[in-house]
């Protein structure tokens, strides 16, 4: 299958491109390399050293004999995107190419506007490119479980059956996003659903949980293929931050009470979910939603697990509750449905102590690269 991976230089996109290439697909990466520029802007970095995209794809070809084509450019530039479609004739378009950080979107007006314009307009361009150049192409779009928020009822997969004043209907599940970033994903979902209805586009919206882990079988082949490990208060997840904090002897900083509960999955499951969606495409005109996660944990749960694992590795990790920079419920109900991908064959890789120890070991190996002041939050929602 001819597959474009947009955002293929990023944390989810890079291992996905390698995995799909290994499975025999003809993979093309489209990326504007802006994720690397965010590091410069924020004076941050990945704990693991990251090779250039050219070095990465060259090493992959050297090791496997498989070629991954690359196009460097922005989805917001429609002429560029159209040319990519004309040259590659994609059968599937995997869309990771969006600004993905809630804190980044909340820095100030400029970052909020950038996040919304970059994400929403880029996604609209993809929809028009499919319509005009590859109408049978299957859009596999990375959404987020954060679109739903934390409602006091079970979270269904995209749609909900409701009864109101004696009438019933199946409607899109209500959205309660918690940042301008999450709002951009909601706008994307609405635009994709509309395009499917009027143009007959086939699309799968993958509402992904928070991704953890470092290596897939492919990235582990050589240090040049290593994936990112972000730990700062803008792009780092709570789990990564706790692991890096324990590696450098810093308190594990839990925001507020720590009862905030979110969905999670291993990076190995991310790449497998993309493959499942590609091999089982949506029907023409269908807007399909899968909740892409395997487990959920509270922030406090994660801190306690990291504390215990760190202790087993001879590290002392103290848990400290700090003021929450976000506007969010710190204790709430959370139960979400995730049956569609399992029904199609997903066999989850769960968050085990061995997984935590593996990431922590890498953090210890590269702890001299950690910029200590970046492990604390710098962005406030208030």
Regions found by a protein language model. Name each.
Residues 187-195, 242, 302, 306:
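Hydrophobic alpha-helix immediately C-terminal to the catalytic Tyr-X-X-X-Lys motif of short-chain
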Residues 54-66, 160-171, 211, 215-217, ...:
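A short C-terminal helix-loop "cap" of Rossmann-like NAD(P)-dependent dehydrogenase/epimerase domains
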Residues 186, 199-201, 211-240, 248-250, ...:
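Glycine/proline-rich active-site loop of Rossmann-fold NAD(P)-dependent oxidoreductases
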Residues 76, 118-121, 179, 233-237, ...:
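Residue-level signal for the nucleotide or nucleotide-sugar donor/cofactor binding architecture
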Residues 123, 127, 192, 239, ...:
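Short-chain dehydrogenase/reductase
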Residues 1-214, 381:
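N-terminal Rossmann-like NAD(P)+-binding domain of SDR-like oxidoreductases, especially those catalyzing
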Residues 22, 246-382:
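C-terminal substrate-binding subdomain of Rossmann-fold SDR/epimerase-dehydratase oxidoreductases
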Residues 73, 85, 115, 227-234, ...:
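Pocket-edge positions in alpha/beta enzyme catalytic cores
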